[in-house]
Design a protein with these regions (language model features):
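Short helix/turn-capping signatures at newly exposed starts of structured segments
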Residues: 1-92, 96-98, 121, 127-134
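Short, exposed beta-strand-loop hairpins at the edges of beta-sheets
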Residues: 103-106, 110-121
Length: 134
């Protein structure tokens, strides 16, 4: 799963990537909901569902959220992506979340990984596309 997350981070941070490119990469049953595209049964091993959210332009992805079949241990994420920054839960009473700033050298954008930690690890991860500030 770590290798898949790294690959998707490079994809989402690529200059010129579109929502359609990312949906094609996920290769599942896609349903366009206007603001986002739900992808059921993506071809990514270990992923049950994905949601690709559009940025304000409607063309590029803002982020992609993956619902995982098996949790990824927090220790594996930290060993692979470095020390995370805790961020507030998505909603009151929601799972703890950890933000990993990823070192993606791929043009004008970079990526961050936000892991929702419950029990044995992260069952939901979000890869966010961020403009490179430095």
């Amino acid at each position: 799963m770590i290798a898949t997350l790294r690959e998707l981070a490079v994809t989402i941070a690529s200059d010129g990537v579109t929502v359609d490119d990312l949906v094609h990469r996920l290769d599942g049953t896609a349903v366009d909901m206007i603001g986002n595209v739900l992808v059921d049964s993506p071809s990514l091993e270990g992923v049950a569902q994905a949601s690709v959210v559009r940025d304000a332009s409607g063309e590029a992805p803002a982020h992609v959220t993956l619902e995982l079949i098996d949790p990824v241990p927090e220790e594996a994420l930290t060993a692979s992506f470095g020390t995370p920054t805790p961020v507030p839960p998505e909603f009151p009473g929601g799972p703890d979340r950890l933000l990993y700033e990823l070192e993606v050298r791929n043009g004008a954008y970079t990526a961050a990984l936000i892991a929702s930690i419950e029990g044995q690890g992260a069952r939901r991860v979000t890869l966010r596309r961020d403009p490179r500030l430095r």
